[in-house]
A protein has these predicted regions:
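Noncatalytic, solvent-exposed loop/strand surfaces
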Residues: 1-341
Length: 342
């Protein structure tokens, strides 16, 4: 189990995300779908008894499990109010399921994918309708074979995006608009059965995306100069704002309907923690911890918790060094090391 499960107390179910199979990138010794890896599994909260599962990647060869928490919400599909679950995957897809049965509420098709007999690849993979939150093919790089989602690897010259940096941070849901919000990291990695390594000269960046939960279609998307799939994630408030903390130290607020940046505050360090909001004394507060926790991103380290309200008086700090946006050093072949930099 990757992260803390979600709980529906009315249904008496918990929803757990499971990790990918091992070895991560070599499927030659583990044929079949490898259940229940890279899946969402629903269990009876009182007994632990299995209720249903949905596998997002069959026979995972790319470390594309889902380390971000699922989101539980209610929404109308086909004219009926349904108890839904949204799961954002590292490949930049959002699976919207009926959390009672595990069946997709947004059409999901088992599509044929490229094959590699030595890797014992699955014949198909589940692909949801709608828009992905990340590019599905690598940007071209000289001397490398360009790969797309579910390109199998056996040689060490194939590259792919968004790679396993896709999404680790929590998403959010706004019941007023019906929008889902997610962060994504986009990086280029060279894959082989022994691991994935950085590709020098390629850029790394992040995306913040709003999707309409009724259609799984993109409403807006913003690019940021760091791997936004790690760290803070997003917080949606009833006032129509989406908050996000970045590796560049900024705590930002966006208009939830348009994506327009309305406010930013420099915390002085990598603002990686999920934001929190609460009300006390009739006033709403929003808080975030700024500690620069991601060693691989070479963030400025700190030890601060910032709390904000309307009319607050504190001044921002000086910004930390900007996180690198271009990979400068490749990891040693076969190590699987993901993000070394000069």
């Amino acid at each position: 189990m990757w992260v803390q499960p979600a709980l529906d107390p009315d249904l008496g179910l918990i929803y757990a995300n499971t990790g990918n199979p091992w070895p991560d990138y070599n499927g030659s010794t583990r044929g079949g779908d490898n259940l229940f890896t890279s899946s969402i599994v629903a269990l009876d909260a009182m007994t632990g008894k299995y209720r249903w599962h949905f596998q997002s990647v069959h026979h995972d060869l790319w470390d594309l499990d889902m380390p971000t928490p699922v989101i539980l919400f209610d929404q109308v599909y086909a004219g009926q109010m349904r108890k839904a679950l949204a799961a954002h995957s590292k490949q930049g897809w959002v699976y919207i399921l009926d959390r009672v049965t595990g069946k997709p509420l947004i059409a999901t098709e088992e599509k044929p994918v490229p094959q590699e007999a030595r890797q014992k690849t699955a014949a198909t993979q589940p692909v949801p309708a709608g828009d992905p939150t990340a590019p599905q093919c690598a940007e071209p790089v000289a001397q490398y074979e360009r790969g797309c989602m579910f390109t199998p690897v056996w040689t060490d010259t194939k590259i792919a995006q968004p790679s396993a940096a896709g999404d680790w941070a929590p998403g959010a849901y706004d019941p007023q608009s019906g929008y889902l919000f997610f962060t994504t990291g986009v990086s280029t990695r060279k894959f082989s059965p022994t691991g994935r390594v950085s590709v020098p000269g390629t850029r790394e960046y992040g995306l913040i995306t709003a999707l309409d939960s009724r259609t799984n279609k993109q409403v807006w998307q913003k690019e940021v100069p760091y791997l936004a799939g790690f760290g803070s994630g997003v917080l949606a408030t009833g006032g129509g704002l989406v908050f996000h903390g970045g590796s560049d130290g900024y705590f930002r607020a966006f208009d939830s309907k348009t994506g327009e940046e309305l406010w930013r505050f420099q915390t002085g360090f990598g603002a990686d923690a999920p934001a929190a909001t609460w009300e006390t004394g009739g006033e709403q507060y929003v808080a975030i911890a700024a500690g620069g926790s991601r060693d691989g991103l070479k963030e400025a380290k700190g030890d601060l918790v910032w709390a904000f309200k309307l009319g607050g008086k504190l001044n921002p700090l000086n910004g930390p060094p900007a996180p690198p946006t271009v990979v400068t050093t490749a990891a040693p072949p076969g190590t699987g090391v993901d993000r070394p930099r000069d």
